[in-house]
Amino acid sequence: MKKDIHPKYEEITASCSCGNVIKIRSTVGHDLNLDVCSKCHPFFTGKQRDVATGGRVDRFNKRFNIPGSK
């Protein structure tokens, strides 16, 4: 194998917005900031959170106050 052709593979810290800190090994070279991780993602926690508060049709009906809409 050739020497000195592989990228540096070092330990970095991945910090989640929920406060969870994960140490991983990567070639990125700098620490990462994550939006979600396995500690706070709804799939892993079993908690469902309502991200979308309504579809486009609901917003249209609400904006123009169409009778028969929600």
From Swiss-Prot:
List the GO molecular function terms: metal ion binding; rRNA binding; structural constituent of ribosome
Q: How is the cofactor bound?
A: Binds 1 zinc ion per subunit.
Return the Gene3D superfamilies for the record.
Ribosomal protein L31 (4.10.830.30)
Instruction: Give the superkingdom in one word.
Output: Bacteria
Please provide, in alphabetical order, the Gene Ontology terms of the cellular component aspect for this entry: ribonucleoprotein complex; ribosome
Protein name, per record = Large ribosomal subunit protein bL31
* HAMAP family the record matches: Ribosomal_bL31_1
One BP annotation, GO:
translation
- Primary role: Binds the 23S rRNA.
Q: Which UniProt keywords apply?
A: Acetylation, Metal-binding, Ribonucleoprotein, Ribosomal protein, RNA-binding, rRNA-binding, Zinc
